[in-house]
């Protein structure tokens, strides 16, 4: 569960290292976001000489949360960190690699490009 002012790691090679959530998209009174949801975030830490700079406002899709999710078959899955992948307006990732495992729910939400780049899908 990611709320405004929550910090997330970046799970791609776009140049950003850490994001801070500003807003969860999908409704005027939406308070939190979970795996597969799109957020608006600000880059708090970034690598030098990369396309994404510090203090840039970006869109990102959440790929891992510590709270986790419960699947319809009764299985619960949670991760060790909160992480997101930076995307563009069309929903494609800005980086060319994705690090760490991601949840299968991203495939259901039509983020197939991120799923294909991921080394492990849980």
Swiss-Prot record:
GO terms for molecular function: large ribosomal subunit rRNA binding; structural constituent of ribosome. GO terms for cellular component: chloroplast; cytosolic large ribosomal subunit. CDD domains: Ribosomal_uL14 (cd00337). One of its GO terms (biological process) is translation. Keywords: Chloroplast, Plastid, Ribonucleoprotein, Ribosomal protein, RNA-binding, rRNA-binding. It is found in: Plastid, Chloroplast. Pfam families: Ribosomal_L14. Binds to 23S rRNA. Part of the 50S ribosomal subunit. NCBIfam families: rplN_bact (TIGR01067). Belongs to the universal ribosomal protein uL14 family. This is Large ribosomal subunit protein uL14c. It comes from Chlamydomonas reinhardtii (Chlamydomonas smithii). The gene is rpl14.
